[in-house]
Amino acid sequence: MAKLNQVTLSKIGKNGDQTLTLTPRGVNPTNGVASLSEAGAVPALEKRVTVSVAQPSRNRKNFKVQIKLQNPTACTRDACDPSVTRSAFADVTLSFTSYSTDEERALIRTELAALLADPLIVDAIDNLNPAYWAALLVASSGGGDNPSDPDVPVVPDVKPPDGTGRYKCPFACYRLGSIYEVGKEGSPDIYERGDEVSVTFDYALEDFLGNTNWRNWDQRLSDYDIANRRRCRGNGYIDLDATAMQSDDFVLSGRYGVRKVKFPGAFGSIKYLLNIQGDAWLDLSEVTAYRSYGMVIGFWTDSKSPQLPTDFTQFNSANCPVQTVIIIPSL
């Protein structure tokens, strides 16, 4: 890390036609972070893209690779307002058992390439503010009138990647019956439980293994071969909190389709069911009974706030819809 070289990132973006040139900015002696940022002709824009590689431990076992893109939203010919930005951010942390080798450093470069393929990063690259492109083009051409703004969507549509197979829901799902008891103030309606139904998702279990960017992701997955199981690296998937969903307050919040349901029998229990597909409702108590082996998986789609929230209350069925439900296999 003592020597940093200029790096050109080419063939990036949706169409593979974007190129960014990053210039070394030095190593921070306090935290060991080495930074490269885009060298643009407009000084106020130089920090739009930053790639950092950190080695915080003295024995160099831990590496953290980060990419941050900042897109100024208010530009003139010579400057931009740095206080107004849209950002996309992705990172990955790698731990090694010894001093870094050429192979391990090659793995970091591979991870960097994987991060650049992150849909949120791709979106930020392809959908930069039109005024930003105008400022860059004017600066690179030596003056003149600003070119017309590119056709950039106001709210890019971020969608989850397609699955590679089929996966049957490993937990019981049911239809909803009629209302068993009308809710009173501060409590939701209670429904009767309907017939059991089978649910199959258009994903294979392998589509989700190897992802290190989950909230409370099971650490046993680190034993998987990340070189071959990286298709979910940093792609916006997240482990939704099935425990927090099981409350009257959550049902009343309407953030996800959760209903309070009375199971059959004179002594039938009251449970919380989550709508996961059509008229199929998942028994959340079965998911949490597995104590982190079961997971309800959502996908973050809000391109206006690309960085995944750490607060579960910020998630809802619009910005992070449910994609599938899995059981993590024993290793």
UniProtKB/Swiss-Prot annotation:
InterPro entries according to UniProt: Levivir_coat (IPR002703), Phage_RNA-type_capsid (IPR015954), Read-through_dom (IPR031819)
| Subcellular location per the Swiss-Prot or TrEMBL entry | Virion
On the tree of life, the source organism's domain of life is Viruses
| Any one Pfam family match given in the protein's UniProt record, by short name | Read-through
Q: Name one GO molecular function term.
A: structural molecule activity
What does the UniProt keyword field contain?
Capsid protein, RNA suppression of termination, Virion
Q: What is its main location?
A: virion
* Gene Ontology cellular-component terms listed: viral capsid
Q: What does this protein do?
A: Minor capsid protein.
Q: What else is known?
A: This protein is translated as a fusion protein by episodic readthrough of the termination codon at the end of the capsid protein. Readthrough of the terminator codon occurs between the codons for Tyr-132 and Trp-133, thereby producing the readthrough extension.
What this protein is called in its record is Minor capsid protein A1
According to its UniProt entry, this protein's organism is Enterobacteria phage SP
